[in-house]
Swiss-Prot record:
Compartment(s) of residence: Mitochondrion
Source organism (scientific name): Bos taurus (Bovine)
Molecular-function annotations in GO: (4S)-4-hydroxy-2-oxoglutarate aldolase activity; (R,S)-4-hydroxy-2-oxoglutarate aldolase activity
A single cellular component GO annotation: mitochondrion
This protein's name: 4-hydroxy-2-oxoglutarate aldolase, mitochondrial
Alphabetically ordered keywords of this record: Lyase, Mitochondrion, Schiff base, Transit peptide
Marked site (Involved in proton transfer during cleavage) residue numbers: Y168
Gene: HOGA1
Length: 327
């Protein structure tokens, strides 16, 4: 967390851009941002001694930047953000912005457990180059995270954020699904532009699309495993871990959906399901980083307590890709 003195100066610096009314941002402040497209949630590379390897981060981004992504997510779940210090998180955002073409959106994961810490991190990430803040649900006290509590939290963050805010619901990690009623209420905030929903419940995604249809609110699928279904129900894009290694294929699936080539899209989606599951639910970030090594990127180790795969797990991971024609 930033020290109080720094936080005070940050608040002072925002006085030129933030509305000081009780309602926060004036209507329409964040609504011009078009999130449509595919975003890889990039990993944070580490050295053998568990230091952040910013050089490898830049190398990966230079390679990924040649693909037709709408943008990139840094410091999301795949970025191991809970294991990084505040200064490391900010440096990752800064280095990413410098490494990426200016036409690529940079979404930065700024979520923290307290509202104040989240505001501080959001403001700081905006100052070092984030185009939007992706804010995960606070979850340590999940039993008290009612719709009212979450609405208050996100409203405060959006009121004080100098960049648009994207809600982030990832129940597999947090044990907390951002309630639909809270999403609908928050969709009315002029500086909240969308949600990344990683829960995999397509019915829920469709309901959010339906209930926010009167707002300029955008839904991003949180996985390549249900990307086709999400497009069919009204999502505008996806934040897909698999795009770190099969980026061209995930972007191809997007194109097939957008052009109505549903039979070809279905065939491709089927071939992406097992690899996607392998680098998410089954083997997680260690699995994703291992496949990055195979596909010409730098994966490397994770930070402890995440452990590398066993030989048997690595073989199972390879089979999930090879059996679908990717290796």
């Amino acid at each position: 967390m930033l020290v109080p003195r720094v936080w005070s100066s940050v608040r002072l610096g925002l006085s030129r851009v933030l509305s000081r009314t009780l309602r926060g941002w004036p209507s329409g402040e964040g609504r011009g941002m078009d999130l449509s497209g595919i975003y890889p949630p990039v990993t944070t590379p580490f050295t053998a001694t568990a230091e952040v390897d910013y050089g490898k981060l830049e190398e990966n981004l230079h390679k990924l930047g040649t693909l037709p992504f709408r943008g990139f997510v840094v410091q999301g779940s795949n970025g191991e953000f809970p294991f990084l210090t505040s200064s490391e998180r900010l440096e990752v955002v800064s280095r990413a912005r410098q490494a990426l073409p200016k036409d690529k959106l940079l979404l930065a994961g700024s979520g923290c457990e307290s509202t104040q810490a989240t505001v501080e991190m959001t403001v700081s990430m905006a100052q070092v180059g984030a185009d939007a803040a992706m804010v995960v649900t606070p979850c340590y006290y999940r039993g008290r995270m009612s719709s009212a509590a979450l609405i208050h939290h996100y409203t405060k963050v959006a009121d004080l954020s100098p960049v648009p805010v994207v809600l982030y619901s990832v129940p597999a990690n947090t044990g907390l699904d951002l309630p639909v009623d809270a999403v609908v209420t928050l969709s009315q905030h002029p500086n909240i532009v969308g949600i990344k929903d990683s829960g995999g419940d397509v019915t829920r995604i469709g309901l959010i699309v339906h209930k926010t249809r009167s707002q300029d609110f955008q839904v991003l699928a949180g996985s390549a495993g249900f990307l086709l279904a999400s497009y069919a129900i009204g999502a505008v894009g996806g934040v897909c871990a698999l795009a770190n290694v099969l980026g061209s294929q995930v972007c191809q699936l997007e194109r097939l959906c957008l052009t109505g080539q549903w039979e070809d899209a279905q065939k491709l989606q089927h071939r992406l399901i097992e690899p996607n599951t392998a680098v998410t639910r089954r083997f997680g970030i260690p699995g994703l980083k291992k496949t990055m090594d195979w596909f010409g990127y730098y994966g490397g180790p994770c930070r402890s307590p995440l452990q590398e795969l066993s030989p048997a797990q690595e073989e199972a991971l390879r089979l999930d890709f090879a059996s679908n024609g990717w290796l």
